[in-house]
Curated annotation (Swiss-Prot):
One GO cellular component term noted in the UniProt record for this chain: cytoplasm
GO molecular function: ATP binding; catalytic activity, acting on a protein; histidine-tRNA ligase activity; transferase activity
Matches recorded under CDD domains: HisRS-like_core, HisRS_anticodon
Keyword Aminoacyl-tRNA synthetase part of the UniProt annotation: yes
One Gene Ontology biological process: histidyl-tRNA aminoacylation
Localization, UniProt: Cytoplasm
E.C. designation(s): 6.1.1.21
Gene (UniProt): hisS
NCBIfam families: hisS
Catalysed reaction, written as an equation: tRNA(His) + L-histidine + ATP = L-histidyl-tRNA(His) + AMP + diphosphate + H(+)
Similarity remark: Belongs to the class-II aminoacyl-tRNA synthetase family.
Record-given protein name: Histidine--tRNA ligase
Length: 428
C-alpha cells in the first residue's frame, strides 16, 4: 500500500492551519461587513456545468478538468473554479425570484481541483475564496467588487499588489474583435501551437491567453480590443475607471488581459504581485470580472453578474513574506499543571470552566511529572500557568503565573469562574 498523498496535494498541518484560519476569518468578517453571505456548493457537479461555463476550448476543460463517470454512469467533474457552481445554485434554487433581495451577494471558501503541473502556489487541489453578485448591471457593482478585492488584500497585509484592468465590451464588440483575431492569426496558422490552431477555429480569444512560445511571439502585434469598443462600452469602462480614480485605487489598463474563462463579458481585472523570490514574473493572486450571460446559459433569466476569486495558496506564499506576524504561533491562554491525589479531576474541571468563558485552556491528559507538564506548557506557548497540588486543593487556593515576566498571584477556586476579573488584576 502506498501511504502518501497524491501528487499535487498538500497536508496543511496544525502549525500551518492557524494562519489559514486567520486569513479565512479576516475574509469572512470582511465579506459580512459588506453584506455578503456565505454559500456552500458541492465539490463535484455534472460535467456540463463546467464545460458550458468555462468553454469547451478553454485550457481548463481541454486539459485540467478532473472528470469521470460515476457508478450510475453520470459524467461528473470536480469543480475547477467556484463561479459555475454558484450560478447553478442561483438558478436551481430560484434565487432570481422577486422576493429575494437584489443584488444577491454571496461569498465562498472551498477546495477546487485542476490537473496541472504543481508549482509554487498552485497545486492540483487548491483553495479559492470568492464573491459573486447577481442582479445589477450598474458600473457601481463592478467598482464595489474591485474595491472589495483591493481592500481585502490590504486588510490581509499584502503590500505590493497592482490592479490590472481591461474590458471585453459587449457582444457586438466581441464579435468584431473575434473576426479581427481570425484575420490576424489565419495567415500564420501553421506556425501556431496545435492548441491555438484549434482555438483559432473555436475561440481565437483564447490564443491571447497562451503560454506557448510559438504563440507568444505573435501576441504583441495582435489587434487590441480597445480599438473595437463602441461608444456604450467605452462609456461604461471610463465610468468604472473614473470611480476607481475617485476612490484612490491605482490601476494599469492591460490590453493583454483576457482571463482564462469564456463566460466573462465587460470589465475584467486581476490583482498581481511581483516577487522574484517566488515567481519569475508578476503573478495573479485575485482575478474576476463581469459575466452577464452565464445565468441564461444555465436556463435562468437574464441576470447581470460580477465577481472575483482568490487563489489562497498563492496568497499564503505572499503573506508569509509580507505579513510574517500572521504566521506566529500565538499559543494558548492557560495551561493547568497538577500533581497529587484528586488534582487531575479538578484540573479538567478548571479547563472546562475556562473554555466556557472563552479562554484557550489545556492540561496534561498523560499526567506526566510536574517538570514535564511545565515543559508542555512552554511548548504550547501558554501565556499563564495555573498550578494545582494537594495542598492547593485542600486550601481552595491556586497559584497563577504569567510566563512573560514571572508575575504570580494567588486566587481561590471560586475566582476561576470569573477569570476576566482575575485577568484585569494581573494586567494591573
Amino acid at each position: 500500500m502506498r501511504v502518501q498523498k497524491p501528487k499535487g496535494t498538500v497536508d496543511i498541518l496544525p502549525e500551518q492551519s492557524g494562519s489559514w484560519q486567520k486569513v479565512e476569518e479576516t475574509a469572512r468578517n470582511f465579506f459580512n461587513r459588506a453584506n455578503y453571505r456565505e454559500i456552500r456548493t458541492p465539490s463535484f457537479e455534472n460535467y456540463e456545468i463546467f464545460s458550458r461555463s468555462s468553454g469547451d476550448s478553454s485550457e481548463i476543460v481541454e486539459k485540467q478538468m478532473y472528470d469521470f463517470n460515476d457508478k450510475g454512469g453520470r459524467h461528473i467533474a470536480l469543480r475547477p473554479e467556484g463561479t459555475a457552481g454558484v450560478v447553478r445554485a442561483y438558478v436551481e434554487d430560484k434565487m432570481y425570484a422577486p422576493e429575494v433581495v437584489k443584488p444577491f451577494n454571496v461569498f465562498y471558501m472551498e477546495s477546487t481541483f485542476r490537473y496541472e503541473r504543481p508549482q509554487a502556489g498552485r497545486q492540483r487541489e487548491f483553495h479559492q475564496i470568492g464573491v459573486e453578485s447577481f442582479g445589477s448591471s450598474n458600473p457601481l457593482a463592478d467598482v464595489q467588487t474591485i474595491m472589495m478585492g483591493h481592500d481585502l488584500l490590504g486588510e490581509l497585509g499584502v503590500k505590493n499588489y497592482q490592479l490590472h484592468i481591461n474590458t471585453l465590451g459587449n457582444e457586438q464588440v466581441r464579435k468584431g474583435y473575434h473576426d479581427a483575431l481570425v484575420n490576424y492569426f489565419t495567415p500564420v496558422k501553421d506556425e501556431l501551437s496545435e492548441d491555438s490552431q484549434r482555438r483559432l477555429r473555436d475561440n481565437p480569444l483564447r490564443i491571447l491567453d497562451s503560454k506557448d512560445d510559438r504563440d507568444k511571439k505573435f501576441l504583441p502585434d495582435a489587434p487590441k480590443i480597445r480599438d473595437f469598443l463602441d461608444d456604450n462600452s467605452k462609456a461604461n469602462f471610463e465610468s468604472i475607471l473614473k470611480m476607481l480614480d475617485q476612490l484612490g485605487i491605482d490601476y494599469v489598463i492591460d490590453d493583454d488581459l483576457v482571463r482564462g474563462l469564456d463566460y466573462y463579458t465587460g470589465v475584467i481585472f486581476e490583482f498581481m504581485v511581483e516577487d522574484k523570490s517566488l515567481w519569475e514574473s508578476a503573478t495573479t493572486i485575485l482575478g474576476g470580472g463581469r459575466y452577464d450571460h452565464l445565468v441564461e446559459e444555465f436556463n435562468g433569466p437574464e441576470t447581470p453578474a460580477v465577481g472575483f476569486g482568490i487563489g489562497e495558496e498563492r496568497l499564503m506564499l505572499v503573506l508569509e513574506k509580507q505579513n510574517p506576524e500572521l504566521f506566529k504561533n500565538e499559543g494558548i491562554d492557560f495551561f493547568i499543571t497538577n500533581i497529587g491525589e484528586g488534582t487531575a479531576q479538578k484540573a479538567i474541571e478548571i479547563a472546562r470552566s475556562l473554555r466556557k468563558q472563552g479562554f484557550e485552556a489545556d492540561f496534561d491528559v498523560n499526567q506526566k511529572k510536574l517538570k514535564g507538564q511545565f515543559k508542555k506548557a512552554d511548548r504550547e506557548g501558554a501565556k499563564y500557568v495555573i498550578t494545582l497540588g494537594e495542598k492547593e486543593l485542600a486550601n481552595g487556593v491556586l497559584n497563577i503565573k504569567r510566563l512573560a515576566d514571572g508575575k504570580t498571584i494567588d486566587l481561590s477556586l471560586e475566582d476561576i469562574n470569573d477569570m476576566n476579573k482575575v485577568m484585569k488584576e494581573l494586567k494591573d
